[in-house]
Amino acid sequence: MKKITTVLAIFLLTALGAQDFKYGVTGNFHQGSIVGVHDVSKGKFGAGLGGFIQFPLVQNDVFDSAWLYLMPQIEYNMGGEWARAEEEKFGIQKYTHDYVAMQVYLKYFFNFGNMKRDYFVFAGPRIEYLVRQDKKVDPAYDAAYYKYNLDDEVAKFGYGVSLGVGIKPTSRWEAFMRFDRGFSKVYPNNNLRNTYNRMLAVGVNYYLNENWW
C-alpha cells in the first residue's frame, strides 16, 4: 500500500508541476500471459482502465504543434493466465493477477516539413503492484506440476517496459496498440525459468481538456 501511495504522489506532483498539460482517461483490451511457467499456458483476456497527463517537451502553441511529450499514466490492469496442461485430465487452471501499474512514456509524433502528423510512437518504463490474486486450480494438477511451476509465491512488485504505436484522428481521441514486457520475476521461488509478465493490447485515449490555453 505504501508503494501505491508513493506512485500516486509522484503522479499528482508531476501533474501539478507541469505547464500546458493535458489530461484524460485511457482504456485497453488485452491478452496477457506469464512466460516460463504452467507448461501449456494460454493468454488470458482482460482490460485496463486509468488516467494520464501529457505535457510538451518542446515548444508548443495554440495549434498544439509540439511533437515530443512526456506522458505519465496510471491504470488498473487485469492480468494472469490460463493453463491447459493435460486439460482432459485436470481441466483449465485459472490464475488471476490484477495490478495497479504506472508507465512514464516518451511520446513522439512524426513530423515532416514542420508539419505534425497524426501518427505517433511511445515507450517508457513500467512499474506494477499486485492488488488482487485469485487461483482456481485442481489440487491434482498442483501436486503433479508444482515441481516444474514452483509458483507458491507471487511477487507483489514488478517492473518492465511498455511501448507502442498509435494514431490521433481527432483532437480528443487516440487509438493505440501496445506491448508490455516484464523484467522482474512473477514467481520468485521458480529458479528454473525467468517467469515474467507480457501483454499485447489495443486501446484508446480520451482527452478531457481539448485546448492548451
Where are these predicted regions, by residue range?
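Sec-dependent N-terminal signal peptides
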Residues: I4-T14
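Residues that define the transmembrane beta-barrel architecture of outer-membrane proteins
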Residues: Q19-F21, S41-A47, T96-M102, F157-V161, ...
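Short loop/turn motifs that connect adjacent beta-strands in outer-membrane beta-barrel proteins
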Residues: Q19-F21, V58-L68, N111-D118, E210-W213
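Glycine- and aromatic-enriched membrane insertion/assembly motifs of diderm outer-membrane
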Residues: K22-G24, H30-S33, V40-I92, E174
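Residues on the lipid-exposed face of transmembrane beta-strands in outer-membrane beta-barrel proteins
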Residues: V25-F29, L49-F55, I74-Y76, M102-Y108, ...
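Predominantly the C-terminal beta-signal and adjacent terminal strand-loop region
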Residues: Q73-E75, G79-W82, D151-D152, V161-S162, ...
